[in-house]
Amino acid sequence: MNIWENRLFLKLMRLVLGVWFRFRAINEEAAKCEGPALLIPNHLSWIDWLFVGLCVDRDWMFAASEMPARTSKLHAWVLSNPRIILIGTDPASALKKMTVHLEAGGKLILFAEGRMSRTGCLQRLFGGTGFLIHKTNPKVITCYLRGAGRVLGSVHGGWTKWF
């Protein structure tokens, strides 16, 4: 089941996140563009993909690590979504898929840091990001998730909260 195809589910999820995390999005229109486009958000928690995914159209694809799918059935189910390009132990093949997608005028969401931030600051981006930008010349959109480091799914050592 592809949850991203169900508009009612997406509206309900947005309402739940609005109540639970006080989620709100500012300037969502920036992501409503023609491809090729590369959306680069900061990465603070395990549910950042959900916050970002609710703000973009269905034609955006995600790039995600396949490692969590090896240990958890929940992660395997989430990562089985056809909108996800999995990055495995050989990142070159995933980078090729991302390049082909962008060259075809596609849109891609890439957590370019490659790992979650423990400080809340943007970390060094992986070299593959520069390669994608140089090779495909996409419109680059940056996205800042403010406060996402305080949700329970974050990895930093500070305080977290439910609501």
Feature locations, PLM:
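A cross-family acyltransferase "interaction/gating" segment
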Residues: 27, 121-163
